[in-house]
Amino acid sequence: MKINKLIWTGILSFAVLFNAVAKDAIHQNEVYDIYLTYTDSTYPGDAVFLKISFKENKKLKKKDKTATSAKAKIAFNDKILFNTKFYSVPEKLSKTKNTFIAALPLSSYAKTGTYDLTVIYSYEGEPNMEFTVPVEVNSKDFVEETIPLNAQNTEIKTNTSPERMSQIEKLNGILGTINEDAVYQITPFAQPTTITRRTSFFADRRTFSYSNGKSSTSLHYGIDFGCPNGTHVTSCAAGKVVLAENRISTGYSVVIEHLPGLYSLYYHMDELKVKEGDIINMGDLIGLSGATGLATGPHLHWEIRLFMNAINPDQLCENFLFAPAAAQNK
């Protein structure tokens, strides 16, 4: 992941730097500066992260102030792929005022090339402004594998019972929830286990071979660690436990909310050590690994969802939200 940083003090200088023209031609640098840091080089299945902050140069009258707002969208060949709003970062986490973050997931099938990243914002009642910067999506190869399933796992995989459908609906409802106040951590995340052996990788292209001779294809949404039964599983970041239960397909499972629309998921555990509603820190014990649910052997499945889209968990173990070094060391 490559990071680009921009300090903009006016439309004209920005247009020269990025060969982009703002739709509103008002020169704003007498009122404020905008600082932008964003992911400008990435891979399919990753996310594009953005952070903006404002420095006020001219004191605005209280009557002119309204809430600062911003949105971002990413497009390829003039087709908008995803859009989202920016979310405010508490000053205790960002150590600065007027800091906002946003994230845009990319499909693991995203084509290589230059994408257009557009930011639209309004600072405390000032006119809306818009600018576009380039993001390069590089090529990446993904593993293709065939997984034979015994009769028990075939039954789980093909289970269409009301109970399983209800569990899927509940999980999707959680992953589709965007809590604007849920900003628990903006520093790099950590791996959820000390085990380093990986048995499956993010976005593997899978074919399941059923015991009845049939088959189906799917995408592997996370990373599998080859953990012996009973291995400690820890939270990859601070957050709130929003699901902790035994599910038909994923066994003993935990879902943790970390940022608006961003969740970590932990599957196939043997025992849970947290309950729904718990507020936890990075590294807290949440369960013991196992082989519950659809599993061909003991392992931990770790997954990250952003606005319901699976993204590469390893990216979040980097400085994905551009936190200062001092904040990362805490």
PLM segments and residue spans:
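Short, well-structured beta-strand-loop connectors
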Residues: 232-241, 274-289
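Zn2+-dependent peptidoglycan hydrolase active-site motif and core
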Residues: 236-270, 303
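Cationic-aromatic interfacial patches
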Residues: 22-143
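Acidic, glycine-rich catalytic/binding loops that coordinate metals and/or anionic ligands
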Residues: 142-170, 275-281, 303-330
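Flexible, gly/ser-rich surface segments that form the specificity/activation loops bordering the active-site cleft
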Residues: 242-247, 284-298
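Bacterial N-terminal signal peptides that target proteins for export
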Residues: 1-8
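Bacterial N-terminal signal peptides
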Residues: 9-16
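Surface-exposed, glycine-biased beta-strand/turn segments
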Residues: 134-250
